Amino acid sequence: MLNSTFGNGKNGALKVVEHLGYIQIDTLSVVARAHHHTLWNRLPDYQEFYLNELLEKDKTIFEYWSHAASYLPMCDYRFSLPRKQHYIEGKSHWFDQDKKLNSYVLDRIKAEGALQSKDFEHKRNTLGNWYEWKPAKKALEQLFMEGKLMVAKRQGFQKVYDITERVLPKSVDTSTPTEKENAAHLIKRAVRANGLVEEKEIAYLQPKLKTAIKNELQNLVESGFLIEIKVENKSETYFSTPEQLTVLNTLKTSGEIHFLSPFDNAIIQRKRVQNLFNFDYQIECYVPEAKRKFGYFCLPILYNNQFVGRFDPKADRKTKTFYIKQLHFEKGFKPTQNFETLFNEKLNTFAKNKFTLHERETLPNYI
C-alpha cells in the first residue's frame, strides 16, 4: 500500500488482483465487504462495479478458492486445477455430496444456461419430495469446487453459475501444473505480494506441497532468483528477491493512514504480523461478546509502516451514519496533532465513501 502504483480505474483494480494473487471474498458487510475494502485501500478511485465487470465482461479474473473464497487473476487459472482434481477424485466441500443431485443440477445448467441457487428453490416432481434448495446449493458448490461450474457473474451478492466451457476464455492455459510449478507459483506470488516471506507462510494450508515448496525455495536461492534474509532479533529465515529487497530498503513512508479489512492480504496471516510488526490482532466477531477486548469488527490502523491501533466501526445504513464504537491505540503510540488531522481526514473519506458521515461514540483508549 505504501507508494502503490497500480494506476486508476478498472485496469488498476486488475493490477491489484494480479499483484496480490488473490482478493478474499467475504459476506460480512459491517462497513464494506472485504473484497471491496481491500481494493479501496490500494485504489482510491475504486468503484464496486469494477470486480463484476472484470469477472463477467472482461473475464480477466475468476472466482475460486485460495485459502478462502477469492477473486483470482485469470492468468493464474491453471494453478486452480490441482485442487479441482482433488474434488473430482472424491473430496467434498464441507458436506457429503449427492452425485445424483449433482448430475441433475449440472444437466439443468447445461440445458437452460446460467442459473442461481434460487432457481432451484421449488420442489421438482422429477426428483421427488426430498429435493429442496439447500441440497441444490450444496450441489452447486460441489460442482464449482470440481471446476465443472464457474461463477459467470454476480447479481447483487448472489452467484450466477454456468458451465466452465461457456465462461472460460479459450485462450486460457488449462494445462495442469506439476508440483514443482505449483510450488514456484506460490513462492513467487507470496514474495511479490509481501516483499519478504517465511517458508511456513507460503506453505500455509498447503500440506501436500510442503516438501515441494521447501525444495523449490532452495532451487530459487541457488539460482539467484531468491535471497535468504535474517531479520534483526528474529530466528526465522525470510526470502525475497534482490529487486524486492532494493524496493524495501529504499521505500519511503508515505505519511498515510489506512484502515484495513480484517481479511486484507496484509493482515490475514496473523502470526506474520505479530512477528514482524509486534501487532497482536484477531477479528472478534467469532469471539463470545463477554470475551471481546476491542469490539465485534475491529479494523487495524496502519500509519506509515506501523500498526498503531484499531477501532470498532458500525454503520447504520438507514440513517447513513457511521459510528466508531471503540478506538484503541497501541501501547507507546501517542497521536500527534498531525496524526489526528490525518486520521480525521481519512475517517471522513472512508465514512463518506461508504455511508455519508461519521460519529465517534467513545474517546481513544491507550493500551
Model-based region annotation:
Residues 1-367:
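Long, charged, low-complexity, helical-prone intrinsically disordered regions
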